[in-house]
């Protein structure tokens, strides 16, 4: 018995000193001590801390009696059914679930940091693209201003050519004073007058018919080619950035899908307050992330549409400017050719008329019987015969002249003019001159400046729109320190209007597709709020499950196999 008491684990747990044993050394107590050592474990022995806590609770009056403990246990069971039946395995499972949720939260925070980094990089890249676009817009404005100045210069040159043509026509059609019929004068004076007239005529043609070569049009065309190449490079760059933007958007959407896959209905929390607080934090974080993602995507889409519209406008303006320059160059070339033809024709006609007058004067002086006069008369007769032969047969210079006029008229009129008769060519030329005069009159009446007037009207409208931003003072004068912010203010106003419209449409879609569906569809409402009822109101959850079972039983299911009537 002494060995039993000295080697008993029961007394060691109780802290009894084996050297001072007060237990009776009786063999009948052996079974009693064995029973006690088999039934008393570490869980049944109060520790010193537990004893102190009990004394403290008794001192504060918080220690419950047996009946009070039974009532408290019933209350806890009523508030949380099955809570007292949980074992250590259930507690371990809930602990593992909480650890898994914490790991998922850390992964979600890391993913959010990556998304913010990606957002900052995309914003920086879009800012660089906006800077490049603004630079190209400035270049486009400079090019348009240069084209407008070239068009104005060309218009002034055409007006000057029209004036000079009218003066030349007046000079050759009006009667000359003094008359050129000087057959009463001697031949020496007549020849002297003819030489002076030819010199005057040559000087007049050189001074008034100046044909200039406009090399600057070629340089402008080369500049347009270079600008077109730059615009094409910019378009390819925008396509590349749009592809990268689509990839980033797909990555964001995939991440959102992964986040949506988290089934919060399977999460069981040990404490309702902790679960509610965690749910509130996750909801705030999710709402903030969704708002940031929506704003980012909306801004990116707006900027992309704006860039696409600006690029289309730039291309249209470039094509219109190119067509105008081509028409101006063709008109200039046609004016040069027509000026040359008219000048050559007038020169030939004047020379022929002078030769005829000389022949007439020499015929009138036929009374002179000198050898020189006889030689002159023979030469004049030969010239007259040559002119008659040329008039009789459309060969030589006249045929070449008629053929050249026919070719030029065909090129200008877009019709095939046959060089059979000079009258037909003259008729077509007269028709062409009439159309040309109509074109000159329309140009002088400013009908060709309709596009410029429309642009001026648009500029005036923009001026009236932006005037409150410029004249923001009691005085009627612009505040120059704020002028550089006007474009940004205008763009922000437009973006705010578009954002308001998008917000209204988004709110309308949410009310129609989410709130309206929750109010109309009972089963959809149960699927949304069932996990909330599971945590807060179990009775409503059981009622919802019964309603779903009734709805499922009401659905007609097709039977399998053959059925006998």
UniProtKB/Swiss-Prot annotation:
GO biological process: cell division; mitotic spindle assembly; mitotic spindle organization; mitotic spindle-templated microtubule nucleation; regulation of mitotic nuclear division
Coiled coil: 135-171, 212-241
Localisation per UniProt entry: Cytoplasm, Cytoskeleton, Spindle
Gene Ontology MF annotations: protein-macromolecule adaptor activity
One GO CC annotation: spindle
Sorted UniProt keywords: Cell cycle, Cell division, Coiled coil, Cytoplasm, Cytoskeleton, Microtubule, Mitosis
InterPro entries documented for this protein: HAUS3_N (IPR032733)
Segment forming the signal sequence: none
Purpose: As part of the augmin complex, plays a role in centrosome-independent generation of spindle microtubules. The complex is required for mitotic spindle assembly through its involvement in localizing gamma-tubulin to spindle microtubules.
Family assignment from sequence similarity: Belongs to the HAUS3 family.
Record text on subunit structure and interactions: Component of the augmin complex composed of dgt2, dgt3, dgt4, dgt5, dgt6, msd1, msd5 and wac. The complex interacts directly or indirectly with microtubules and is required for centrosome-independent generation of spindle microtubules.
Miscellaneous field: The name 'dim gamma-tubulin 3' derives from the decreased gamma-tubulin staining of the spindle pole seen following RNAi-mediated knockdown of dgt3 in S2 cells.
Protein name from the UniProt record: Augmin complex subunit dgt3
């Amino acid at each position: 018995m002494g060995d039993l008491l000295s080697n008993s684990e029961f007394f060691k747990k109780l802290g009894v000193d084996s050297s001072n044993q007060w237990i009776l050394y009786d063999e009948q107590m052996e079974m009693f001590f064995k029973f006690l050592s088999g039934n008393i474990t570490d869980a049944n022995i109060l520790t010193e801390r537990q004893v102190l806590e009990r004394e403290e609770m008794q001192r504060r009056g918080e220690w419950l009696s047996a009946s009070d403990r039974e009532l408290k246990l019933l209350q806890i069971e009523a508030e949380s059914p099955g809570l007292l039946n949980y074992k250590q395995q259930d507690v371990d499972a809930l602990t593992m679930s909480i650890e898994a949720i914490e790991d998922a939260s850390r992964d979600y925070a890391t993913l959010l940091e990556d998304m913010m980094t990606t957002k900052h990089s995309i914003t920086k890249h879009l800012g660089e693209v906006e800077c490049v676009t603004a630079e190209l817009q400035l270049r486009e404005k400079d090019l348009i201003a240069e084209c407008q100045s070239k068009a104005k210069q060309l218009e002034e040159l055409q007006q000057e050519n029209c004036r000079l043509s009218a003066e030349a026509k007046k000079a050759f059609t009006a009667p000359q004073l003094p008359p050129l019929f000087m057959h009463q004068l001697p031949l020496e004076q007549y020849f002297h007058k003819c030489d002076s007239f030819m010199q005057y005529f040559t000087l007049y043609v050189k001074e008034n018919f100046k044909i200039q070569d406009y090399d600057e049009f070629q340089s402008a065309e080369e500049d347009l080619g270079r600008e077109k190449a730059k615009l094409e490079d910019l378009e390819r760059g925008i396509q590349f950035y749009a592809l990268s933007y689509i990839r980033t958007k797909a990555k964001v959407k995939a991440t959102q899908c992964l986040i949506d896959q988290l089934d919060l209905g399977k999460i069981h929390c040990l404490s309702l307050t902790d679960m509610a607080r965690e749910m509130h934090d996750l909801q705030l974080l999710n709402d903030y992330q969704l708002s940031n993602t929506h704003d980012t995507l909306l801004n990116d889409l707006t900027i992309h549409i704006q860039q696409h519209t600006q690029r289309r406008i730039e291309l249209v303006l470039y094509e219109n400017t190119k067509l105008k320059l081509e028409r101006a160059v063709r008109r200039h070339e046609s004016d040069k050719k027509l000026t040359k033809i008219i000048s050559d024709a007038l020169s030939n006609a004047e020379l022929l008329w002078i030769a005829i007058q000389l022949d007439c004067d020499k015929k009138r002086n036929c009374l002179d019987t000198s050898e020189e006069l006889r030689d002159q008369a023979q030469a004049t007769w030969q010239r007259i015969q040559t002119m008659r032969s040329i008039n009789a047969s459309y060969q030589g210079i006249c045929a070449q002249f008629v053929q050249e006029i026919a070719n030029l008229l065909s090129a200008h009129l877009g019709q095939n003019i046959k060089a059979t008769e000079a009258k037909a060519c003259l008729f077509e030329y007269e028709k062409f001159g009439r159309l040309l005069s109509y074109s000159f009159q329309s140009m002088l009446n400013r009908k060709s400046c309709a596009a410029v007037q429309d642009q001026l009207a648009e500029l005036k409208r923009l001026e009236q729109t932006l005037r409150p931003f410029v004249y923001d003072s009691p005085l009627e004068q612009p505040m120059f320190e704020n002028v550089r912010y006007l474009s940004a203010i205008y763009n922000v106003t437009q973006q705010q209007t578009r954002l308001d419209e998008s917000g209204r449409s988004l709110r309308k879609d949410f009310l129609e597709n989410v709130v309206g569906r929750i109010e109309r569809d009972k089963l959809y409402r149960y699927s949304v709020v069932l996990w909330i009822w599971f945590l807060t109101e179990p009775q409503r959850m059981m009622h919802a499950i019964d309603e779903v079972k009734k709805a499922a039983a009401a659905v007609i299911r097709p039977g399998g196999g053959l059925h006998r009537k």
